[in-house]
Amino acid sequence: MKLSNVFLAAVVILTCVCVFQITAVPFIQQVQDEHHVESEELQENQHLTEAEHRLTDPLVLFRTKRQSHLSLCRFCCKCCRNKGCGYCCKF
């Protein structure tokens, strides 16, 4: 009985060692993967800061010259002294 328990324990340990060796990543590859992840994060952060800069840029918030050929009227109710619904051009 003891011999079978020792044999079973040896088989389990040997199996674990084999599995861990197969799934192990070499140190050089792990360092390269970490460097690749860091460079991707840096690129993402740089892209986000550019997007935030475009959103907070005050020149973006100002309207450009209005096109004179575009109508600035819209259909609305109870606006521009209209008692009912109609076109309002106060914009």
Swiss-Prot record:
<feature type="signal peptide">
    <location>
        <begin position="1"/>
        <end position="24"/>
    </location>
</feature>
<feature type="propeptide">
    <location>
        <begin position="25"/>
        <end position="64"/>
    </location>
</feature>
<dbReference type="GO" id="GO:0005179">
    <property type="term" value="F:hormone activity"/>
</dbReference>
<dbReference type="GO" id="GO:0140367">
    <property type="term" value="P:antibacterial innate immune response"/>
</dbReference>
<dbReference type="GO" id="GO:0071393">
    <property type="term" value="P:cellular response to progesterone stimulus"/>
</dbReference>
<feature type="disulfide bond">
    <location>
        <begin position="80"/>
        <end position="88"/>
    </location>
</feature>
<dbReference type="GO" id="GO:0001530">
    <property type="term" value="F:lipopolysaccharide binding"/>
</dbReference>
<dbReference type="GO" id="GO:0050829">
    <property type="term" value="P:defense response to Gram-negative bacterium"/>
</dbReference>
<feature type="disulfide bond">
    <location>
        <begin position="76"/>
        <end position="79"/>
    </location>
</feature>
<dbReference type="GO" id="GO:0042834">
    <property type="term" value="F:peptidoglycan binding"/>
</dbReference>
<comment type="function">
    <text>Seems to act as a signaling molecule involved in the maintenance of iron homeostasis. Seems to be required in conjunction with HFE to regulate both intestinal iron absorption and iron storage in macrophages. May also have antimicrobial activity.</text>
</comment>
<feature type="disulfide bond">
    <location>
        <begin position="77"/>
        <end position="85"/>
    </location>
</feature>
<feature type="disulfide bond">
    <location>
        <begin position="73"/>
        <end position="89"/>
    </location>
</feature>
<keyword id="KW-0964">Secreted</keyword>
<keyword id="KW-0044">Antibiotic</keyword>
<dbReference type="GO" id="GO:0042742">
    <property type="term" value="P:defense response to bacterium"/>
</dbReference>
<dbReference type="GO" id="GO:0005576">
    <property type="term" value="C:extracellular region"/>
</dbReference>
<keyword id="KW-0372">Hormone</keyword>
<dbReference type="GO" id="GO:0071383">
    <property type="term" value="P:cellular response to steroid hormone stimulus"/>
</dbReference>
<dbReference type="GO" id="GO:0060586">
    <property type="term" value="P:multicellular organismal-level iron ion homeostasis"/>
</dbReference>
<dbReference type="GO" id="GO:0070891">
    <property type="term" value="F:lipoteichoic acid binding"/>
</dbReference>
<dbReference type="GO" id="GO:0009617">
    <property type="term" value="P:response to bacterium"/>
</dbReference>
<comment type="similarity">
    <text>Belongs to the hepcidin family.</text>
</comment>
<dbReference type="GO" id="GO:0006879">
    <property type="term" value="P:intracellular iron ion homeostasis"/>
</dbReference>
<protein>
    <recommendedName>
        <fullName>Hepcidin-2</fullName>
    </recommendedName>
</protein>
<keyword id="KW-0929">Antimicrobial</keyword>
<dbReference type="InterPro" id="IPR010500">
    <property type="entry name" value="Hepcidin"/>
</dbReference>
<keyword id="KW-0165">Cleavage on pair of basic residues</keyword>
<keyword id="KW-0732">Signal</keyword>
<dbReference type="Pfam" id="PF06446">
    <property type="entry name" value="Hepcidin"/>
</dbReference>
<keyword id="KW-1015">Disulfide bond</keyword>
<dbReference type="GO" id="GO:0050830">
    <property type="term" value="P:defense response to Gram-positive bacterium"/>
</dbReference>
